[in-house]
């Protein structure tokens, strides 16, 4: 598991947080709070699998700060397939964010689970 982060001070480049969980079934990315400003993050989660038999399927559930945000189960098409989720989340001053991705599969093999959060310009 590898965490990539680029935190910033006010006036510098936007924050970029990423977690490459490899073939893990669960990934958690923690974004610490800022004591000085509110922030908006674009969050992307990608789950990639390889089918090992006919009838393969994959599922991804996303939690933000412990609350289920989204969940989907789909049939795996082709030799490899991905299941992606994208959302935006606004964080007030002092608010942290925990992004958790949980996966399941049938007749498939996990290849990669990746979470990325990129700070966006304000409203």
What is the role of each PLM region?
Residues 53-68:
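Short, surface-exposed beta-strand/strand-loop-strand elements in extracellular ectodomains
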Residues 32, 44-50:
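Short edge beta-strand/loop segments characteristic of extracellular beta-sandwich folds
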Residues 38-43, 88-112, 120:
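Noncatalytic modules at the cell exterior or secretory-pathway interfaces
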Residues 13-19, 68-78:
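Solvent-exposed serine/threonine-rich low-complexity stretches and specific carbohydrate-binding patches
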Residues 1-26, 30-35, 105-123:
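C-terminal interaction-tip segments
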